[in-house]
Amino acid sequence: MTFLPPQLAVGGLFLIACFVSTSMGTSVGTISALAPFAVSMSQATGFDIVLCIAAVASGAMFGDNLSMISDTTIAAVRTQGCEMKDKFRMNFLIVLPAAIITLILFVVMAFGGYGQVEVGTYSILKVIPYLVVLIGALIGINVFVILMTGTVLSLIVGVTSGAFAWTDIFSVMGNGVTAMYDITVISIIVACIGALVKEYGGIEWLIRFVRKRVNTQKGAQLGIAALVAAVDVATANNTVAIVMTGSIAKDISEEYDIDPRRTASLLDIFASVVQGILPYGAQLLYASAGAGVSAMQIIPYMFYPYLMAVSAVVFILFQKSTKKA
């Protein structure tokens, strides 16, 4: 943010959230980390706090969908039997137009800010753990190994930079877990409601309803998208939605000769689309709590999920699917 004029600050916030979420593999973690900065930036520049927090949440959904250490990516590739790096390439090409247009929209809407963003001091050293995790994931290092490496590096950087003493390592880790308590409880309650929906046949009805209406390859892809989106509405958890619909999506993709990389990408994309605009989803609940606004106020400014859906539908309709040789 040091190098950006105030008019580009909201767009810069979106880019930072994209980078952090792709490195961390978690949208909720990204929102919790950047929400305070969004609030302070709004106060300093005069930008609407809703716009600022929406930029953070939109960027968070970018990484939640794309990151190779994200649980949604892992669930999608495991259920479809493809490689993470292959899914990443295809998924990236699908959502890139949406990300670019989103950036432009945030810049245009924020143009005319009058304040100055106070970025404070920063250290390149503290960025190293994020870069290691991001690069390690991109080159295909085992997820568990790269996450453990990132955690150890973060602790080393924290101690060497004076952020905390080595004797406080476990308390710092504990504080991180404790900070997620409220949203975890809410997520558990929503998951319980989703389990009740499944137990009483709601999810099975959705699956039958969608499958009966699939007749062509394009229809199959739209059906997969609708299926995972509907299940995410019911469960408010995109990972759970992908796991629950993964097997039926694989059956449909094999029947209609759809590339597994494409199916994995569509599952992840449309689960993220819905998750990003659910007022009772963990992401918007955490964003609204951090900014002190209603989730319903944020939803109209969640440009990225909307554009991601448009981009994916255009891809389905105009890009023929053929299985990888």
Identify the residue ranges that each predicted region occupies.
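Hydrophobic transmembrane alpha-helices of multi-pass solute/ion transporters
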Residues: 1-8, 118-191, 205-209, 213-214
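Hydrophobic alpha-helical transmembrane segments of multi-pass integral membrane proteins
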Residues: 5-37, 58, 210-250, 267
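C-terminal transmembrane helix pair
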Residues: 72, 79-100, 217-325
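Alpha-helical transmembrane segments of multi-pass membrane proteins, especially transporters
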Residues: 9-17, 28-35, 51-60, 73, ...
